């Protein structure tokens, strides 16, 4: 029996000679350790290098996998990702590789407190996406996160208030004065005479980290988005929390345009390059309302929404 196993990727030339922009693997199941306190992702990874040597039959997939498996046992940081990309390129020096890219996708599990009930909290899952690329000696790292929130239509709210006002006037026509407790009781009985439509909504944001970034800070990105929107969906709730959520929605009426602009203003204070895509799953319509915006110098392209 021969002691040497054949390696046709090395010994047999390609019958079709052409360089390839990217070659590698995708949808690799792998656990990813985030920064201290950031938790762990049950992630799916994609990893590729370029293949400039047109005559070679293929790259060495196992080298990519082993590097990924070894390096991702340590917490992910910008420095770690930059080092991993360089190692991927160097592992294919015999292919003359000069570029590498890596994506990590998964759901970040965060425990979120209830709005009012002390000691009550629940889990939220946030889809996140980390993309790192090294090409021509330059490394870029992008983060993408998805946040769910509630949006209440400003127009529908105004129409509902008008109906409520008209009903109040009609039922109290001819009366010059009303006692405070009488008005309060009428509102208690008829305050839902008309209600504005609201819906679960989705925001996807992608940012490019500055070259000197020390941390990924995914939790910070999620927090910035939820702070800007003010109405993130909740996990565990009791009646006081549901009432507080209703108050937040009333204080933050939003068209899809408003949501996109809120996020743009918030992200512009922290990132030089970003892209925002929002989608309101309309309860009034059978279609969705969408909006996109980005930084003035963004070259990130659309999100994956």
Swiss-Prot record:
Residues the record marks as site: May be catalytically important: 153
UniProt entry keywords in alphabetical sequence: Hydrolase
Keyword Phosphoprotein found: no
InterPro entries per UniProt: GTP_cyclohydrolase_FolE2, GTP_cyclohydrolase_FolE2/MptA
Pfam families recorded: GCHY-1
Keyword Hydrolase: yes
Catalytic activity line of the entry: GTP + H2O = 7,8-dihydroneopterin 3'-triphosphate + formate + H(+)
Coiled coil spans: none
Listed EC numbers: 3.5.4.16
Known pathway: Cofactor biosynthesis; 7,8-dihydroneopterin triphosphate biosynthesis; 7,8-dihydroneopterin triphosphate from GTP: step 1/1
GO biological process, one term: tetrahydrofolate biosynthetic process
Molecular function via GO: GTP cyclohydrolase I activity
Protein's job: Converts GTP to 7,8-dihydroneopterin triphosphate.
PANTHER family: GTP CYCLOHYDROLASE MPTA
UniProt similarity note: Belongs to the GTP cyclohydrolase IV family.
Name recorded for this polypeptide: GTP cyclohydrolase FolE2
Species whose genome carries this gene: Xanthomonas euvesicatoria pv. vesicatoria (strain 85-10)
């Amino acid at each position: 029996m021969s002691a040497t196993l054949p390696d046709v990727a090395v010994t047999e030339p390609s019958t079709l000679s052409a360089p390839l922009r990217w070659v590698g693997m995708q949808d690799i199941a792998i656990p990813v350790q985030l920064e201290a306190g950031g938790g762990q992702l049950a992630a799916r990874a994609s990893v590729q290098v370029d293949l400039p040597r047109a005559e070679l039959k293929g790259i060495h997939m196992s080298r990519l996998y082993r590097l990924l498996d070894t390096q991702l046992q340590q917490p992910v940081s910008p420095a770690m990702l930059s080092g991993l990309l360089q190692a991927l390129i160097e592992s294919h020096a015999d292919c003359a590789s000069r570029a590498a890219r890596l994506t990590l996708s998964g759901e970040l599990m965060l425990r979120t407190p209830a709005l009012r009930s002390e000691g009550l909290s629940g889990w939220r899952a946030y889809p996140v996406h980390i993309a790192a690329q090294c090409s021509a000696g330059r490394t870029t790292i992008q983060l993408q996160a998805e946040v769910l929130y509630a949006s209440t239509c400003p127009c529908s709210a105004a129409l509902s208030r008008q109906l409520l006002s008209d009903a109040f006037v009609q039922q109290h026509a001819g009366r010059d004065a009303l006692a405070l407790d009488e008005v309060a009781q009428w509102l208690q009985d008829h305050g839902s005479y008309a209600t504005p439509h609201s819906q679960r909504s989705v925001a996807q944001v992608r940012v490019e980290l500055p070259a000197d970034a020390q941390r990924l800070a995914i939790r910070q990105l999620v927090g910035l988005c939820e702070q800007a929107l003010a109405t993130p969906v909740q996990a565990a709730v009791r009646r006081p929390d549901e009432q507080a959520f209703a108050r937040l929605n009333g204080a933050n009426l939003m068209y899809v345009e408003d949501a996109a602009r809120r996020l743009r203003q918030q992200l512009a204070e922290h990132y030089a390059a970003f892209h925002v895509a929002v989608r309101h799953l309309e309860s009034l319509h059978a279609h969705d309302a969408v909006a996109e915006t980005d930084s003035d110098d963004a070259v990130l392209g659309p999100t994956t929404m």
